């Protein structure tokens, strides 16, 4: 990651030197646009477009605009690009503690992986899975857990009902759904209690919701729930590993997708949190910790809740302001435990487990090189509770839970690492922004609508694969086209 930061600062230094040379009347470097109509420097601007956020959405938008001739500056608050992707080195191997997976129906992800010369590996799913349903542990193969037959029937009918309803919610404008106000007036738990009427099934669905959204059904608008499921291809595709949204992961870590785009994205400043955006006539000025920059347009790609912490002048319209105030972020703690052996495989287990009470999910995260690893998510309300506890107490809970499912050998990992996304000051949570009842139907149209010269992107604004890395890339493509249609290219 240090090399990427060096490249970033070198590019920024080069841009400053180029501007200084022009101000002194020097010749433009070869390949630089000549001053003239459409050149931002004629009007004293630093760039055509400023992008706030150096994650997948921001860098995708920036490189698309740079490729069409726009001068672009990316301002990333953290010390490295990546957004909600984060790859760390543990025991000499690289692991993702942020966004990780891709799957069928994600063309932009696979195109970018190929473009950057990266590769993927399938998520390990051979062997039996574990379901900890309200304290009762069972193992099963395939998609169907070993539960009471009546519970299984209710669950299958419930999933069918959910998928049938989510297909009625438009991907582009869920607030235009004929039943939008009705569904946005209740929580996902309200609907489940009225329609599933089985505590075990409700517990299983809530367990899935915690993983997908990082929150509980009681906090989630049913309209938002349905829209997200429709965008992701339905309930089963969102929770499945094999042939689902968790089908494969990037060898060497997903953050490489962001670092690989840096050389294509114009000038990128890290350690530059944005504090204020001012619109003044035909320009915008953006105040960051790395200085103030001016441009014709600004694209904000940070999480919705984080965008609410930026000061805007003039203030945002009521619709946009009310939406951002209501958006929350999911709570997710991602934990890695490395071992000398894949002992769970030797016992015929896949490494996958779900607990409805503990709020945990596990996967086999063993590297292609053979470094044995178990990955655990602590999600939803349990994650918020554990975030407040001492680190050693949290570690003990994680290892006790792994022992509960995989045996005493899980108690002594060779390496242990956790990442609490709610504690990340420039992310605020994971995996996605969530909306309580009464938000999408009333304020949803402000989600993607530009505010003057301010444009919005980020995975939550995507039409397909909302909340996934694919959705972030889609939103970057969409906002780049939006800006290109309005800004004249030199």
Residues of each region from the PLM?
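N-terminal Rossmann-like FAD-binding beta1-loop-alpha1 element of flavoenzymes
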Residues: 47-74
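Dinucleotide-binding Rossmann-like beta1-alpha1 core, especially the glycine-rich loop
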Residues: 93-165
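Conserved flavin/dinucleotide-binding core of flavoenzymes
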Residues: 2-38, 141, 234, 283-285, ...
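Glycine-rich active-site loop/strand segments that organize a redox cofactor
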Residues: 83-109, 166-177, 227-237
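Active-site/ligand-binding neighborhood in enzyme catalytic cores
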Residues: 170-273, 280-283, 301-305, 311, ...
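Central helical "cap/lid" subdomain
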Residues: 272-281, 286-346
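A short alpha-helix-loop-beta-strand transition element characteristic
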Residues: 110-131, 199-206, 343-350, 411
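Glycine-rich FAD pyrophosphate-binding loop
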Residues: 66-90
């Amino acid at each position: 990651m240090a090399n990427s930061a060096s490249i970033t600062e070198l590019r920024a230094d080069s841009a400053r030197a180029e501007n200084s040379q022009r101000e002194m009347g020097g010749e433009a470097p070869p390949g630089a646009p000549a001053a003239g109509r459409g050149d931002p420097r004629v009007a004293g601007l630093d760039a055509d477009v400023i992008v706030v956020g150096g994650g997948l959405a921001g860098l995708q938008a920036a490189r698309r605009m740079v490729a069409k001739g726009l001068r672009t500056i990316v301002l990333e608050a953290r010390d490295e690009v990546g957004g909600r992707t984060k790859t760390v080195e543990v025991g000499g191997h690289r692991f993702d503690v942020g966004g990780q997976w891709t799957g069928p129906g994600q063309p932009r992800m696979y195109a970018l992986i190929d473009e950057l010369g990266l590769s993927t590996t399938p998520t390990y799913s051979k062997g039996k899975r574990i379901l900890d349903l309200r304290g009762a542990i069972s193992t099963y193969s395939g998609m169907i857990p070993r539960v009471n037959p009546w519970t299984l029937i209710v669950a299958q009918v419930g999933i069918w009902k959910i998928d049938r309803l989510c297909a009625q919610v438009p991907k582009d404008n869920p607030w235009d759904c004929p039943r939008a106000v009705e569904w946005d007036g209740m929580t996902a738990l309200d609907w489940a209690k009225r329609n599933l009427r089985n505590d075990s099934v409700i517990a299983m669905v809530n367990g899935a919701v915690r993983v997908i959204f990082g929150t509980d059904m009681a906090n989630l608008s049913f309209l938002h729930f349905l829209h997200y499921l429709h965008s992701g291809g339905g309930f089963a595709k969102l929770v499945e590993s094999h042939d689902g949204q968790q089908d494969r992961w990037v060898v060497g870590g997903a953050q490489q997708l962001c670092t690989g785009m840096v050389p294509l994205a114009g000038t990128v400043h890290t350690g530059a949190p944005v504090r204020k955006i001012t619109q003044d006539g035909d320009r915008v000025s953006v105040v960051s910790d790395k200085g103030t920059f001016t441009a014709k347009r600004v694209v904000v790609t940070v999480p919705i809740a984080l965008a609410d912490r930026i000061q805007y002048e003039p203030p945002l319209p009521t619709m946009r302001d009310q939406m951002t105030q209501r958006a929350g972020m999911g709570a997710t703690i991602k934990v890695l435990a490395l071992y000398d052996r894949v002992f769970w495989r030797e016992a015929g287990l896949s490494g996958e487990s779900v607990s409805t009470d503990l709020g945990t999910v596990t996967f086999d995260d063993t590297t292609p090189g053979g470094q044995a690893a178990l990955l655990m998510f602590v999600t939803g309300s349990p994650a918020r509770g554990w975030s407040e506890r001492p680190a050693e107490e949290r570690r003990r809970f994680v290892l006790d839970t792994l022992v509960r499912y995989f045996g005493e050998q899980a108690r002594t990992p060779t390496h242990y690492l956790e990442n609490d996304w709610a504690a990340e000051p420039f992310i605020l949570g994971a995996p996605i922004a969530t909306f309580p009842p009464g938000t999408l139907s009333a304020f949803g149209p402000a989600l993607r609508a530009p505010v003057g010269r301010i444009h919005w992107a980020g995975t939550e604004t995507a039409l397909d694969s909302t909340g996934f890395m694919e959705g972030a890339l889609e939103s970057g493509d969409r906002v780049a086209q939006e800006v290109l249609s309005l800004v004249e290219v030199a």
